[in-house]
């Protein structure tokens, strides 16, 4: 992203959410986007996934402007996992994951032997091969989320974007999901980018954090760009420069920069 401006049009005019954002995603890394409600995380994610056009600046993917890709070509480079569930509850797990191959199949969507192999590898990568014949409506929230991640893997894209993938999961499933996404980013050399409100898990498991905030007073070594709403760095960098303390700490809530943990006062 180079000098990116994000926002959207409303009945009352254009709403500018953030401007002059400069950042990049690396392959082989898990990057987590965190920030307060209403600060613009969803708008940024929708802009990165080409659902919203940028107001200014440029997004480049593999060195080429995002707007120059056709929808079919973009679907081979970028996979998106949304929070809401699909309405195709009568599909099986394997059938839904197979839909991830649609950018590569012909008009009728017939899967080749190679496609079927990729589907099976994707199911195995997230640990749900044994669930492949289950109907979607029989799955738990955690199993369903794994199915959607497997579908994204089946697209064989270098970039996967996820909108709050742990939002409706219990705590053990949240941990398992983020651990799995970190592993997939590292093992498959993918860039995996997600928004989340699970701050402490993101701090512990992300390779990089993108923190959206209204104040841009954070110093180096964390990367930042004056005028944007985004501070980028490793969890350690953002702890040392005060970004995480500024974002997390309130009355009764303390962020320990040494251990990267959050402590809540009981008094």
Model regions and ranges:
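Conserved ABC ATPase signature
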Residues: 135-139
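The feature captures the beta-strand-to-loop junction immediately N-terminal to the Walker
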Residues: 34-36
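H-loop/switch region of ABC-family ATPase nucleotide-binding domains
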Residues: 196-197
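Helix-to-loop junction immediately C-terminal to a conserved catalytic motif
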Residues: 49
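Conserved ABC transporter NBD signature motif
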Residues: 57-65, 74
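ABC ATPase nucleotide-binding domains
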Residues: 236-240, 246-267
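Catalytic Walker B motif of ABC-type/P-loop ATPase nucleotide-binding domains
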Residues: 160-163
């Amino acid at each position: 992203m180079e000098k990116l401006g994000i926002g959207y049009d409303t009945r009352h005019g254009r709403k500018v959410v953030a401007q002059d954002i400069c950042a990049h995603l690396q392959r082989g890394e898990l990057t987590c986007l965190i920030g307060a409600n209403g600060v613009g995380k969803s708008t940024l994610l929708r802009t990165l996934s080409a659902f919203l056009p940028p107001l200014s600046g440029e997004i480049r993917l593999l060195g080429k402007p995002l707007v120059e890709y056709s929808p079919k070509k973009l679907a081979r480079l970028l996979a998106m996992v949304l929070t809401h569930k699909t309405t195709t509850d009568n599909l099986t797990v394997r059938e839904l994951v197979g839909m991830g191959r649609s950018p590569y199949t012909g008009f009728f969507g017939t899967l080749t032997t190679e496609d079927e192999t990729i589907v099976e590898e994707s199911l195995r990568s997230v640990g749900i091969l044994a669930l492949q014949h289950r109907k979607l409506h029989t799955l738990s929230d955690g199993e369903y989320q794994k199915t959607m991640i497997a579908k994204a893997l089946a697209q064989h894209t270098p970039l996967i974007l996820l909108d709050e993938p742990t939002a409706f999961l219990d705590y053990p499933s949240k941990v398992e999901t983020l651990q799995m996404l970190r592993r997939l980013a590292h093992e498959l050399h993918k860039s995996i980018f997600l928004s989340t409100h699970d701050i402490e898990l993101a701090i512990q498991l992300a390779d990089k954090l993108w923190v959206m905030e209204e104040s841009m007073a954070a110093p180096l070594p964390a990367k930042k760009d004056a005028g944007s709403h985004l501070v980028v760095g490793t969890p350690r960098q953002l702890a040392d420069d005060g970004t995480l303390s500024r974002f997390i700490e309130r009355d009764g809530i303390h962020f320990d920069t040494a251990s990267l943990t959050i402590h809540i006062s009981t008094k």
